Amino acid sequence: MPVLEHVDSLLYLGLMSGTSADGIDAALVRFAEDTHRRCELVAGTTVAWEPQLRETLVALGQGAETVAIDALGQLDAQVGLAFAAAANQLIRDSGVERRRIRAIGSHGQTIRHRPEADPAFTWQIGDASRIAEHTGITTVADFRRRDVAAGGQGAPLMPAFHLAMLGAGDQDSAVLNLGGIGNLTLIPRDGAVLGFDTGPANALLDSWCQRHHGTPFDAEGAFAASGRVDAALLQALLADPWFALPPPKSTGREQFHLDWVLQAMGSARLDAADVQATLLELTAASVADALLRLQPSTRRVLVCGGGVRNPVLLARLAARLPGVVVESSARYGLDPDYLEAMGFAWLAAELLAGRAANLPSVTGAAGPRLLGAIYPA
């Protein structure tokens, strides 16, 4: 890639690994102005986790495994080194001079998210000191815990970024991120933005596919398309009290994992493809139900995250939302594969600019807060 022409542009690098832990997304972002209301994806890459490390992270995330303090300390360092390596790879591939990148915004890897606990907590690992040390770039991390300390859920954080990039239009709209967990940003023509997790998305689909189909994800939804939705199982899954909770709410693998699915199945003997089809329908149903309940006037849903590559899921979502345009965020210049990583670059920029970046209407926090901690180069 040629040297950037806009010497007055603000370059930030965002790093993200989500609930699915399918890889580290790295995005190099140019902000056109100090207000950070417009951005351009300069370059992006996804670096796969080392398989054994991914297995450990997934098990930790769903509470299926405990780790000794020494092992957890080493895991934190390993994740930090992996994030640094992903950043360095992107910088090399992009041809951008390292000194031109003002900061890195790193989400880290969530290993536990307990906003309902007393006291509430959320925990992301990935030693930011090592990222700063191995990249030579100031790193901003630990974005969620200040919101939790202020009484919020600490999630989702992307609605503030969605609002900054898209603004309120002339009709009610929504942004749907289909990552490991689904989450919605509701942007009304007027009034406060609302954002919340909708429930499981790729995390369950990927896990079931890995166990019963031998592939890490369901390419284009083909496995789900080969099965039929089991109405009884779908009803049992949707009966989980979490779905009826009002926002603000957030969740993770601690709540929605394969043992949860197996418990709902009980003694029923179902074809693996039928379960996959049912899990896909669960994602579509939980999103559509929430949208129709909380902003029924929505006329456009922009989709991002890995689920945008699943045409079967998008078709089922559209079928449950008649009269609503369901389309990729790419239509509006926001790359669906890297939107979350771009968002964490934006969060880093907002902290360094001294601006609060949470939305209390989304997370339930007591008020606006500066998010993140700075690790100088």
UniProtKB/Swiss-Prot annotation:
GO biological process terms, semicolon-separated: 1,6-anhydro-N-acetyl-beta-muramic acid catabolic process; amino sugar metabolic process; peptidoglycan turnover
Catalytic activity: 1,6-anhydro-N-acetyl-beta-muramate + ATP + H2O = N-acetyl-D-muramate 6-phosphate + ADP + H(+)
Pathway: Amino-sugar metabolism; 1,6-anhydro-N-acetylmuramate degradation; Cell wall biogenesis; peptidoglycan recycling
Assigned keywords, A-Z: ATP-binding, Carbohydrate metabolism, Kinase, Nucleotide-binding, Transferase
Function in brief: Catalyzes the specific phosphorylation of 1,6-anhydro-N-acetylmuramic acid (anhMurNAc) with the simultaneous cleavage of the 1,6-anhydro ring, generating MurNAc-6-P. Is required for the utilization of anhMurNAc either imported from the medium or derived from its own cell wall murein, and thus plays a role in cell wall recycling.
Entry similarity comment: Belongs to the anhydro-N-acetylmuramic acid kinase family.
DNA-binding recorded as keyword: no
EC number(s) recorded for this UniProt protein: 2.7.1.170
UniProt xrefs under Gene3D superfamilies: 3.30.420.40
GO molecular function: ATP binding; kinase activity; phosphotransferase activity, alcohol group as acceptor
Pfam families attached to this UniProt entry: AnmK
UniProt-recorded name of the protein: Anhydro-N-acetylmuramic acid kinase
Organism: Xanthomonas oryzae pv. oryzae (strain KACC10331 / KXO85)
Domain of life of the organism encoding this protein: Bacteria
Binding locations of ATP: G18, T19, S20, A21, D22, G23, I24, D25
